[in-house]
Amino acid sequence: RSIYNRGVEAGSAPYVPRLFHDVYTGVDVRQKKALSAGELHKLLYEDPKSERLRRTQIIAALMFQFCGMSFADLAHLEKSALDQSVLRYNRIKTKTPMSVEVLDTARGMINQLWSNQEPIPDCPDYLFDILCNNKKRKDERAYREYQSALRNFNNRLKDLARVLRLKSPVSSYTLRHSWATTAKYRGVPIEMISESLGHKSIKTTQIYLKGFELKERTEVNKGNLSYIRNYRLG
């Protein structure tokens, strides 16, 4: 899939919607993607002394503070998704309806990004200026634009990790996996983690479990943020 995406972006391969829909492209469970609490703290809170990398750091921090939101979901958030202090949206991958309370720290970061972003006349609906194509991944141009944005973010994230001297590899998946691992380490029920991430299922028995309220999921999110922010390095 990665090779195909590069080919489409370079114009060497035709764009075929949902080409890998019936092909398993999941992650090997043996491949560790989550950062330790110490490295995650450094990634999100140490000063990279670079405006370019600071913007990347803010985006990464928002992904973590939005309950491990994927880069695709963050990039495609529309302004209408922000309803006062709650984000309401459908996941790009599964179309699962999601709601995330925007913590005060996240609100400050959103304002930081807004203060430095230029208005995009052709696409005024996105919450952030990560994308500007108004087709929302429904055509080849939008698909290429998103793949390019994802590649650029991952490259800058690697630069950020290198500047902060992290030993572990990082990518856009790192924030999502790290949020889930932090919650698991803190004893949060797997059902709560799954629902907060917007996963469709973990076990058949989960169908019979009561859903968690937004207030409960917000407390889990606040706990994760507090744990990482206050983590004491060596």
Residue ranges with predicted function:
Residues 21-22, 76-112:
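Conserved tyrosine-mediated DNA breakage-rejoining catalytic core shared by Y-recombinases
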Residues 34, 91-95, 134, 197-222:
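Catalytic-site neighborhood detector that most strongly recognizes the C-terminal catalytic loop/helix
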Residues 14-71, 75:
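Basic, Lys/Arg- and aromatic-enriched nucleic-acid-binding interface segment
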Residues 40, 103-167:
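Active-site/catalytic core of tyrosine-dependent DNA strand-transfer enzymes
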Residues 5-28, 123-129:
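Short, charged hinge/linker segments at domain and secondary-structure junctions
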Residues 49-50, 145, 154-195:
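Short, basic (Lys/Arg/His-rich) helix/loop patches that form interaction surfaces
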Residues 101-104, 112-113, 210-234:
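DNA/chromatin major-groove-contacting recognition/catalytic segments
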Residues 80-86, 166-168, 188-207, 233-234:
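Short, polar N-cap/turn motifs at the start of nucleic acid-interacting alpha helices
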